[in-house]
Amino acid sequence: QGKRHWLNDSYWLVMPYKLKDAGATLKYLGTESTQTGKPADILQLTYKTNNLSPGIRHKIWIDKKSRLVSQWAQYAKLTDKQPLFVVPWDDYQQHGDILLASERGSHDISDIMVFTGLPGEVFSDFTRTDLSRYHEAK
């Protein structure tokens, strides 16, 4: 159950890095503007093997100027014409050694925290941990 939640939830934070996942298949689809009118290259992301979400397809807009992911769509099935959602991918900020975006339209992420290390109890105690008491990477 935890793995299923992590696979789903991690997309909302680190989806651009999923382009390099083992089993990822990328296909160049051409060029298209985002919903805000910015020109982008389009990639399709599918997985050869993904037992937790078989058949899901992603459409990813790569901004022509910044070369960063600028929009993301997810389709429930490979053959679906209409996506489940289309969200912007904006407001990139440096968090330690990683570049992350927080703007997702109505799904914005406002509490991104990146750590260089955490004590073991964070991973073994299933009560909600107050992560603000630990030192964040800058």
Feature roles, as predicted:
Residues 1-56, 79-80, 135-138:
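Flexible, processing/modification-adjacent segments and terminal tails
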Residues 39-129:
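Gly/Pro-enriched, hydrophobic low-complexity segments
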Residues 12, 17-18, 23, 67, ...:
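A generic structural signal for solvent-exposed, polar alpha-helical segments
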Residues 126-138:
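Long terminal segments
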